Amino acid sequence: MNLSSNDQPSQGRIKAKDWSTDLCECWMDINSCCLTCWCPCVAFGRIAEVVDRGSTSCGVSGAMYMIIFMLTGYGGSSLYSCFYRTKLRAQYNLKERPCCDCCVHFCCEPCALCQEYRQLQHNRDLDLVIGWHGNMERHARLAASTPSAPPLQAPMSRLV
């Protein structure tokens, strides 16, 4: 087994985790597969909104992706989206697999977007359709509705 430098934890760093699914396992979630193949700007916009933690909207990111694609072709949009893959990996401590992020996006943009979408949706319990802010509200509602354990009482003692 040949370990690259990305697999070995450095001092004080936690070892990077594997992706939940492989790059070419698009069939694992047919809905995200269809979305990334037929509407990559929408898939990218949703990914970017979550990776940016709501600082950019799905619409703005998706429009930027489409404009870059229309002006530069496949290469420009792949370059733009590969930076978000790098950001996503850093946030969730994921391995750089199967090769460097830009190569993954240049060689197979739809598969890369689909893998990122699956990672966020299924392994981070995020609904990419409702965006970052919608997910934060949903998680806050769930936390508020979860009953907490009653406080522990001191044991009873007898007065003699």
Swiss-Prot record:
Keyword Transmembrane: yes
Function field: May be involved in heavy metals transport.
Protein origin, superkingdom: Eukaryota
Pfam families xrefs: PLAC8
Broad class of where this protein is predominantly found: membrane
NCBIfam families on file: A_thal_Cys_rich
Keyword match Membrane: yes
Family recorded in the similarity comment: Belongs to the cornifelin family.
Membrane topology: Single-pass membrane protein
Compartmental location: Membrane
Segments crossing the lipid bilayer: 62-84
UniProt name for this protein: Protein PLANT CADMIUM RESISTANCE 11
GO cellular component, one term: membrane
GO BP term, pick one: pollen sperm cell differentiation
Keywords of the record: Membrane, Transmembrane, Transmembrane helix
